[in-house]
Amino acid sequence: MIDLFLNNPQRSYRIDERIISKTGDDYEVLDQIGCGGNGVVYECIDRAGSVYAVKFLLSLSQKSKTRFSQEVLLMQKANHPHLIRYIADGTVEAVENNKNIVEIDFVIMEKADRNLLDYMKSNEKPEYEEYAPQFRGLCEALAVLHQFAIHRDIKPENILIKGETWVLSDFGLCSFLSPEDHQDITKLNEKVGPMFWMSPEAIDCYYFGGKEIGKYSDVFQICLVFVFVLTHKYPGGIFSAENIDTTPLIKELILEAISNDYHK
């Protein structure tokens, strides 16, 4: 048996060490490798010996469950080498606080080596030959994602590194574009987006009840991440060409994207 905790040892969920997906495949749950606002991430291994990451949703509220199901659906729909790869999903029976029997949702995905923030903390600024193909790949991946949804939560922690590939992950705050999939449960004036990385329209929406957050917001956020990679500093203030050390074309595209114009 394994005890799952969510930043609180007094709130635990005990599950069997083997979980079974909706397709009938079973996985052994190993060590914890991450923790978020509503869930925990563990390493897991299948019968063939392949190692993956499994995310357990430890919030039982309907709002959290709806967001989680939308996240899983988006992982299934959006396929690209620079988007986190879906493997399987399902539910597992758990004992909550040694008392109640509850159902815990989980999703299994490819396992990364680390996230971009951890990488930047332990490394100098990457060379052009390393970051340029990753920037291009992430932009292409975002274009694929935008066929279905808006991410709204792009930050270095949500960009994972697997081998030499940077992968966009964590679709928990995504807003679907199609009416049949769309169920935006974000309240008016609810903060959407991470500190340091919020777009002008996200700030306007949060503080002043402004317009909806659209695709341009994602472009703004991912280009702020690119600035972080290129400068090794958290973004803030007014940027100029002198602040960013890269090729003229990349510099021009980034500065255009992080302007305060909603339509750029």
Can you name each region flagged by the protein language model?
Residues 1-22, 30:
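Juxta-kinase regulatory segment immediately upstream of eukaryotic protein kinase catalytic domains
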Residues 30-36, 41:
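Protein kinase glycine-rich loop
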Residues 62-77:
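AlphaC helix of the eukaryotic protein kinase fold
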Residues 79-95:
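Conserved HxN/HPN-centered segment at the entrance to the catalytic loop
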Residues 98-115:
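Conserved short submotifs of the Hanks-type protein kinase catalytic core
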Residues 134-135:
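Activation segment signature within eukaryotic-like protein kinase domains
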Residues 138-149:
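Protein kinase catalytic-loop region centered on the HRD/HxD motif
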Residues 186-205:
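Conserved activation segment of eukaryotic-like protein kinases, specifically the C-terminal portion
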